[in-house]
Swiss-Prot record:
Species classification: Viruses, Riboviria, Orthornavirae, Negarnaviricota, Polyploviricotina
Keywords of this entry: Capsid protein, Helical capsid protein, Host nucleus, Host-virus interaction, Ribonucleoprotein, RNA-binding, Viral nucleoprotein, Viral penetration into host nucleus, Virion, Virus entry into host cell
The protein's role, per its UniProt record: Encapsidates the negative strand viral RNA, protecting it from nucleases. The encapsidated genomic RNA is termed the ribonucleoprotein (RNP) and serves as template for transcription and replication. The RNP needs to be localized in the host nucleus to start an infectious cycle, but is too large to diffuse through the nuclear pore complex. NP comprises at least 2 nuclear localization signals that are responsible for the active RNP import into the nucleus through cellular importin alpha/beta pathway.
Gene responsible for this protein: NP
Biological-process GO terms, alphabetical: symbiont entry into host cell; viral penetration into host nucleus
Source organism per UniProt: Influenza A virus (strain A/USA:Iowa/1943 H1N1)
Basic and acidic residues composition-biased segments: 8-21
Cellular localization per UniProt: Virion; Host nucleus
One example GO MF annotation: RNA binding
Name the UniProt record assigns to this protein: Nucleoprotein
Motif Unconventional nuclear localization signal, residue range(s) on this chain: 1-18
Sequence segments annotated as region (Disordered): 1-21
Short sequence motif named Bipartite nuclear localization signal, residue ranges: 198-216
HAMAP family: INFV_NCAP
Length: 498
């Protein structure tokens, strides 16, 4: 559990490691990446993909999804117990795109899950290598975060669409373990808890009996994960109150929505990792790069270096802008969907535009889309600088949370001041007098009111030249403060509803 008294680094969460030193962590993360790469090469061989087809991000997504589905034990068990027409619970597959006579063709493939598991284990020295599976889940989650807005899901659970910057990881499966919990935003955790509370209100047996006991344990665990994300004593105390409730109901629901709103200013700590598609790792391994020997980190320069030297292609619909498609994937690769656009633009070296201005739909192609008119292009995933990924939430004075950055959740540890209109945020707190009035609430509101917009987050932190591998010379960018850089605000992105 992230930061439950045990401070483990991401890489340790990522590799289920006990305490390891930096070199061991880099090696075990490298081992995980190498395993994904070897698996991908083997799958491309099985499917007889050309080099170009193997570097197509849509093919990568299908192959990643197949292995995740092959290892989804709960769903596999469910499918076997509830057979549905036309679905073989023992098989998995998806669309593979091939270039035939100058045109892109869609081919639906089907494999035995057992066979996929065999190939995966073989690529990972016989292990199940769950860390590698989680890594792919986080990549898919980051891609969803950059592609879709969760307004509808927020409204359904009684939260405000303005809280979209708290929704990182909202599409991650529950089985994604500690590494998955670390990258979930405050809003995501709140939403999961609210769903449980609502079920408990509607279904009297939800908390009862043997099953109810398991439910209760899951509820308390989720409360602890969320508590660990908050950085102020008052927010944590409120989480204890929510967790210890005998019969979670309306009061807890109110407390949680209050906490979610408070997280817009008193930011939670949410991890950010650069998880790349398998079609980046595969060719790197094929070219002879030994990730385990060289070591790898998800939060340092390594993903940037890897992307500088990678060719990735994508299918492009007739009216889409390839540069915009590239931006979408770049943001997903660096988990930057909720980062300030000014910071992202500086690091990338080209202007990063808000979601509503992008002429591109998602990366996945629906089965009913016409392939006749489909083109393809190179994704531009390179960057001008690199920066360290953060998990602090950008609160200004260490030890105690203060003003985090509104409407964004920082990804990069780079100095910026906080453009925000406190009145807008505080307006969200008036008029809601339900739930408990408590010292904790008063304290939280007091902290928020005293947050100063002119504060600077990540004081003295900067970006680095790509030649500066040891991060020796930080370049502290100065930003034009006139516009605040939220990606989703004023937006009409598609909804994610599966």
């Amino acid at each position: 559990m992230a930061s439950q008294g045990t401070k483990r680094s991401y890489e340790q969460m990522e590799t289920d490691g006990e305490r390891q030193n930096a070199t061991e962590i880099r090696a075990s993360v490298g081992k995980m990446i190498g395993g994904i790469g070897r698996f991908y090469i083997q799958m491309c061989t099985e499917l007889k993909l050309s080099d170009y087809e193997g570097r197509l991000i849509q093919n990568s997504l299908t192959i990643e999804r197949m292995v995740l589905s092959a290892f989804d034990e709960r769903r596999n068990k469910y499918l076997e117990e509830h057979p549905s027409a036309g679905k073989d619970p023992k098989k998995t597959g998806g669309p593979i795109y091939k270039r035939v006579d100058g045109k892109w063709m869609r081919e639906l493939i089907l494999y035995d899950k057992e066979e996929i598991r065999r190939i995966w284990r073989q690529a990972n020295n016989g292990d199940d290598a769950t860390a590698g599976l989680t890594h792919m889940m986080i990549w898919h989650s980051n891609l969803n975060d950059a592609t879709y807005q969760r307004t509808r899901a927020l409204v359904r659970t009684g939260m405000d669409p303005r809280m979209c910057s708290l929704m990182q990881g909202s599409t991650l499966p529950r089985r994604s373990g500690a590494a998955g919990a670390a990258v979930k935003g405050v809003g995501t955790m709140v939403m999961e808890l609210i769903r449980m509370i609502k079920r408990g209100i509607n279904d009297r047996n939800f908390w009862r009996g043997e099953n109810g006991r398991k439910t209760r344990i899951a509820y308390e665990r989720m409360c602890n994960i969320l508590k660990g994300k908050f950085q102020t004593a008052a927010q944590r105390a409120m989480m204890d109150q929510v967790r210890e409730s005998r019969n979670p109901g309306n009061a807890e629901f109110e407390d949680l929505t209050f906490l979610a709103r408070s997280a817009l200013i008193l930011r939670g700590s949410v991890a950010h990792k650069s998880c790349l598609p398998a079609c980046v790792y595969g060719p790197a391994v094929a070219s002879g790069y030994d990730f385990e020997r060289e070591g790898y980190s998800l939060v340092g320069i390594d993903p940037f270096k890897l992307l500088q030297n990678s060719q990735v292609y994508s299918l492009i619909r007739p009216n889409e802008n390839p540069a915009h498609k590239s931006q979408l994937v770049w943001m997903a690769c660096h988990s930057a969907a909720f980062e300030d656009l000014r910071v992202s633009s500086f690091i990338r070296g080209t202007r990063v535009v808000p979601r509503g201005k992008l002429s591109t739909r998602g990366v996945q192609i629906a089965s009913n889309e016409n392939m006749e008119t489909m083109g393809s292009s190179t994704l531009e995933l390179r960057s001008r600088y690199w920066a360290i990924r953060t998990r602090s939430g950008g609160n200004t004075n260490q030890q105690r949370a203060s003003a985090g950055q509104i409407s964004i959740q920082p990804t990069f540890s780079v100095q910026r001041n906080l453009p925000f209109d406190r009145t807008t945020i505080m307006a969200a707190f008036t008029g809601n007098t339900e739930g408990r009035t408590s010292d904790m609430r008063t304290e939280i509101i007091r902290m928020m009111e005293s947050a100063r917009p002119e504060d600077v987050s990540f004081q003295g932190r900067g970006v680095f030249e790509l030649s500066d591998e040891k991060a020796a010379n930080p370049i502290v960018p100065s930003f034009d403060m006139s516009n605040e850089g939220s990606y989703f605000f004023g937006d009409n992105a598609e909804e994610y509803d599966n």
